[in-house]
């Protein structure tokens, strides 16, 4: 089973200011809305009203079968896994937390 870092999501208080900051550094904004923005370089900005996820890091996986395998392994180990969710960008993911409480997302392109 292989994983690839997909993105890191951070919370911001002022979306416009944060987007302008990253764009001034040469980051390429792929998606921008009032509650979250995403840059090609793998930075996701979560606005104050975004409540789908906490700050997290996301691992890109191959497909639904791999997602089911990971979810089963985690639940067998006693970890809670959210139900898979289809995002507006077409990806499907689920969230879980590591033993230290850090949120982790696993996602694939549907």
Residue ranges and their predicted role:
Residues 2, 9-44:
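Core segments of cupin and vicinal oxygen chelate
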Residues 21-28, 45-47, 61-64, 75-79, ...:
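Generic alpha-helical propensity signal that fires on short helical segments
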Residues 6, 25, 33-35, 55, ...:
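Residue-level marker for the onset of beta-strands and adjacent loop->beta junctions
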């Amino acid at each position: 089973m292989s994983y690839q870092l997909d993105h890191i999501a951070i919370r911001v208080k002022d979306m416009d200011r944060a987007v302008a900051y990253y764009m001034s550094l040469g980051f390429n904004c792929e998606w921008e809305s009032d509650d979250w923005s995403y840059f090609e370089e793998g930075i996701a900005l979560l606005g104050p009203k975004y409540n789908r996820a906490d700050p997290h890091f996301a691992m890109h996986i191959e497909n639904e079968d791999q997602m089911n395998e990971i979810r089963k392994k985690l639940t067998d180990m006693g970890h809670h896994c959210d139900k898979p969710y289809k995002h507006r960008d077409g990806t499907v993911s689920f969230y879980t937390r590591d033993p230290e409480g850090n949120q982790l997302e696993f996602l694939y392109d549907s």
